[in-house]
Amino acid sequence: MLQVGARNMQNFALLRRLATTKKPILLKRGPSAMVKEWLLAAEYLLSGGNGQVALCERGIKTFETATRNTMDLAAVALAKELSHLPVVADPSHGTGKPSLIGSVSRAAIAAGADALLIEVHRCPERALSDGAQSLDLPQFEAVMQSLALPLRALGTSKGAPA
């Protein structure tokens, strides 16, 4: 899967080229992009011939400074309502705080996210990038276990831990 980072969401030369590939594309929402702009960027890929597009909500820039970004869970639900595309939620970038990843992951699943993108590293303090917002392996296992009940309550088993 090829990932279009948030800052390249409206790089139309890149999107035009990616539309010609036969590889799945994860389109991250820009930090200041409206949902409509995000969906139109996805449409750019689709109309160029690539039907393998997934949307990724990774938080937006707001006035809040306590978190790296503000995870827009309404955008997850709205994208599901307005589009046929799968929606991925990235609570790592959406919060920038490992302590919030579990609760925001559960909220994203409740909002309709089809998948989660979570930063994990064996030793986050030594990670070359995104270490401050990464989970270590035991933390990741705990988050995954915490998803089992909400997934069952929603009547789905999307990647649910056993």
Task: Specify the residue positions occupied by each region the protein language model found.
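Active-site loop-to-helix "anion-binding N-cap" substructures in soluble metabolic enzymes
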Residues: 8-20, 154
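Glycine-rich phosphate-binding active-site loops on the catalytic face of alpha/beta enzymes
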Residues: 5-10, 108-133
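Active-site/ligand-binding-proximal alpha/beta "capping" segment
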Residues: 44-111
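Surface-exposed amphipathic alpha-helices with a cationic face
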Residues: 19, 42-46, 77-83, 144-152
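Short, well-ordered secondary-structure micro-motifs
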Residues: 14-15, 37-40, 64-69, 98-100, ...
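C-terminal helical cap(s) of enzyme catalytic domains, especially alpha/beta-barrels
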Residues: 123-156
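Catalytic beta/alpha-barrel core
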Residues: 1-12, 24-35, 54-59, 66-67
